[in-house]
């Protein structure tokens, strides 16, 4: 009988240790996965931060660094900046629009992708509607700020941007903001004929959430910035601007990037590591006591 009791006691102890071990493994696995997800999220947003590309940005008296970027990737054709927003990125173009959905401007795989000109557009911006795509991301990354223009107060305060191409800075005067279906063929095809251009002008007039009193003619060169929106099924936010010979220097603030957000995420990672260490210490102590 004593032998049977001892066997039962040993079995219970082994089972108890086994349950503790399984629980520890599950907790550590979940915490490790959470830590990895935070780290991976950091990597995506770090690559999407406009500050990463600032050293390559062409300036009035210096474009050498931009040419160096073009040597790294000859798909780089220009630079887009929307004043007083976080949109301040190199611009790329290739024969396949899908490529830069998940490729950065240096040609590396990246979930944040790049800001890219529609493959069917002329890289010298001689078309009537020049369509530029970018991911809508949180933390104001990539084209995340396009959605801000659907707020009338924001739209009213943000009029200008700049587009650098062919070695020259050109101004952009933003005219309208629209929300359209992604499958709207008129909106996302390059207009060639005069009829198509007139139809595009009507599209803007009839679908703008907000529009400035600026005339558009078929002889203009429009810059169409488009990105996803969750406000409607298959929705796209479409910011319409017009190229001008006048440039518009930014007057207020520079892009501050995502340093604070990254710091917060790194703090979370440190807390996870501390908790893992504490859990292991408690488990070891419990085993010793037993």
Describe the predicted segments one by one.
Residues 1-16, 290:
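N-terminal Lys/Arg-rich, disordered targeting/topogenic segments
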Residues 11-265:
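Solvent-exposed, non-transmembrane regions of membrane-associated and secreted proteins
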Residues 255-290:
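C-terminal single-pass membrane-anchor helix
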């Amino acid at each position: 009988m004593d032998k049977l009791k001892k066997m039962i006691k040993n079995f219970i102890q082994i089972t108890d240790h086994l349950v503790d071990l399984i629980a520890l493994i599950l907790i550590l696995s979940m915490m490790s996965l959470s830590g990895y997800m935070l780290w991976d999220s950091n990597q995506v947003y770090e690559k999407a931060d406009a500050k990463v590309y600032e050293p390559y940005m062409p300036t009035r008296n210096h474009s050498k660094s931009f040419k160096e970027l073009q040597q790294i990737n000859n798909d780089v054709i220009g630079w887009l900046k929307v004043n007083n927003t976080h949109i301040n990125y190199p611009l790329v173009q290739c024969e396949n629009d899908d490529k830069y959905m998940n490729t950065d401007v240096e040609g590396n795989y990246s979930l944040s992708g790049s800001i890219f000109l529609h493959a069917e557009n002329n890289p010298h911006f001689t078309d009537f509607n020049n369509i530029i795509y970018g991911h809508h991301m949180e933390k104001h990354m990539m084209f995340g700020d396009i959605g801000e223009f659907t707020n009338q107060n924001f739209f009213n305060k943000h009029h200008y941007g700049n587009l650098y191409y062919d070695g020259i800075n050109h101004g952009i005067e933003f005219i309208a903001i629209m929300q359209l279906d992604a499958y709207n063929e008129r909106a996302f095809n390059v207009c060639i004929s005069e009829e198509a251009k007139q139809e595009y002008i009507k599209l803007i007039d009839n679908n703008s959430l907000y529009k400035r009193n600026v005339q558009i003619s078929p002889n203009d060169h429009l810059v169409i910035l488009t990105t996803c929106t969750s406000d409607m099924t298959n929705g796209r936010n479409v910011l319409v601007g017009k190229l001008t010979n006048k440039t518009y220097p930014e007057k207020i603030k520079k892009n501050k990037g995502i340093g604070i957000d990254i710091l917060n995420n790194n703090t979370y990672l440190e807390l996870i590591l501390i908790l893992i260490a504490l859990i292991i210490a408690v488990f070891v102590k419990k085993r010793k006591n037993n």
